[in-house]
């Protein structure tokens, strides 16, 4: 949940401050993805509560619980290519995280497993959109496409 909240903020603020994007499609994509990430965080928080846990309530504690270093949005709001590259890296990290969660929950917690596989599918879709966008603009991809691994 914590990494999802960080990604939400990164996407949201990028959509707000970015300049010089290659069209409104990218800004709209970031806004839509930000709202999806917020929805993911809500689903995960609800599942944590269902399992008897407590979600982290202090945003200052988000980075400590993610296992991923916080990557702040770029200060150069005109560097759309690097902003996209940063978001591709964020999606790849989310895919790795959700792959690990599917491995941990497969055969043990079917409710969480089903939740996480749905979130994983969303992240793969987001990553592929961004990689296709970068590829269609004739720029170097910078990252290899991550693929969701089957856990069975």
Task: Annotate the PLM regions.
Residues 1-152:
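Iron-associated oxidoreductase/ferritin-like identity signal
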